[in-house]
């Protein structure tokens, strides 16, 4: 059966005021590797290897104790050289932490290092020289503190002799190193345990994350038809009745250029000015847009099931006539958002983050529309090129992947919240699998367009485009996770999702002789 065509009369559109700006900022700032997770290795296939200097880069769990009090675990990376760390650790493997003198560890230490873990700072000499000095001083391991909030891969050069280092060599970020050093203030005893847990062969979080992403796209695409309904285009808003007259944001071809420039500037800002306050700014923006999303989704669901709730209104100063539903839902949504913001580092905070994120994306896909595949092609191809450049090409310019560095964040301040995430229950790291909002929203705009196009042209699931694009999105996302598994690193999902969605509708349109109509449509 064909989808009912929308009414020929122009429906009143839902206004969102400030939410448009907030959603746009999140859309531009939500660029993280599409499928990301905490892998046990950092292999990239590029860093040089030489005989005796060919260890895999492994992710290291660095746990430390201050006067017997266990602190949070930190993350490090092993060197190409040195002894390989065990996959498990026990209290018997703990070693006392000692800062060598000099603190860079480039010369024989005046502080005794025997059977300890030397905690040295980066600089003044090579990684290999530091390792040789620490080993000659009797250290059981070397823990290097980087001079920036990132992890540097420690390699050998062609001019280096075969290192033959017999102790583990690990690096931690500057912020992680500061935590260890601060624990040693005042003469406190600090013990360190380092080991490299292996990644489990099965990641049970990925199927659930896949379902959330695919379900979000499907739900948001059909929301206005299934939940809101043609008879009720005026869902409750944060403002009064006049707010409902605002038009839906219809993207144009020039949006692609605006996206490339603005998103790149935002990404570079976060890369060069990576700080606690900038992370908190993004958290605040996420909370505001999440509040809008929660209110919108809850309000439309209530109004859909309760006809009388739609009509109950009260007059408020400035806001005008506001529905009773809004007066009830908005405070509850605000409490939910505030509780999440306060407890965002708790083990179950991901539930609230995912709920706010899904509601926000449903709202975005009701507010922002693609009118045809001409605009879709410009936007998605630009986003595709954006992902490729900032993940794979930027290391040749900035010495590291800008997007991955921003997505990884730092050990200080909150993590970037613009992702759907799911805990990896079977992983020793207790990390998360993630997918960025942009990798749901950009293809979602095209999928939502296909649903509106099918309705406008009286097509059903068998001869329309919506079902095919949903299958294409699901297939592309599956390929993303296959790439994650094979390459052992975060994947730019749009690399797979743009061909599987845009390529699908272009191919089908050409085969059916409807490509010109799709290209110039206005739905």
Curated annotation (Swiss-Prot):
It holds the Pfam family Peptidase_A22B. Residues 1-35 form the signal peptide. It is an enzyme of class 3 (hydrolase). GO terms for molecular function: aspartic endopeptidase activity, intramembrane cleaving. Keywords: Endosome, Glycoprotein, Hydrolase, Membrane, Protease, Signal, Transmembrane, Transmembrane helix. It comes from the Eukaryota. Residues 229-254, 299-321, 369-377, 452-465, 511-523 are cytoplasmic. GO terms for biological process: membrane protein proteolysis. Belongs to the peptidase A22B family. The PAL motif is required for normal active site conformation. This is Signal peptide peptidase-like 3. It comes from Oryza sativa subsp. japonica (Rice).
